A protein has these predicted regions:
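Pyridoxal 5′-phosphate
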Residues: 1-167
Length: 167
């Protein structure tokens, strides 16, 4: 996992939560069956990157989502590496995160998708921005920069992927 996710898991451990880490197999992924075997009755969150930032290995996100569908477990995927490469679906995903810098948006902006049934609490209390999910004034220029970068990626995705493959 990317340090942004791994360090969050380590923080949860320091707060007294049990965290299970799974090692990737020879193909660089964690399989659905390995995740299924690691699930416990009290597992509340599974977090798996969509595409590995170092190897490019793509994880079976759709199958993991199907596995967790009827379980009391939320599913998060870090999609930062996948967003420019493929159209993503959020079917069965409770939380999806991505950072804008991978698609040439301003550094320091990203986005979070949250399904309507997934809980979320403000990290910092304060103003009522974003329906109370965050405190502080939104960085409108960065938001617009991310929006434009996302539009360009969607419009030119096939061309970009072909260029990546040729490199």
């Amino acid at each position: 996992e990317h340090p942004s996710v791994r360090k969050s898991a380590e923080f949860l451990e320091q707060e007294g939560f049990d965290v299970t880490y799974l090692a990737p197999n020879k193909d660089g992924i964690v399989t659905v069956s390995e995740i299924e075997q690691a699930l416990r009755e009290d597992t509340r969150l599974v977090s798996v990157m969509t595409v590995n930032n170092e190897t490019g290995a793509r994880f079976p996100i759709e199958e993991i989502a199907a596995l967790l569908k009827d379980k009391p477990t939320y599913f998060h995927t870090d999609a930062v590496q996948a967003f420019a490469q493929e159209a993503l679906t959020v079917d069965g995903i409770d939380y999806l995160t991505a950072s804008g810098h991978k698609i040439y948006a301003p550094k320091g902006i990203g986005f979070l998708y949250k399904s309507k049934d997934a809980p979320i609490h403000a990290l910092i209390k304060g103003g009522g921005q974003e329906l109370g999910f965050r405190a502080g004034t939104e960085n409108v220029p960065y938001i617009l920069g991310l929006e434009k970068a996302m539009q360009i990626v969607v419009e030119k995705r096939d061309e970009l992927v072909q260029n990546y493959q040729e490199l």
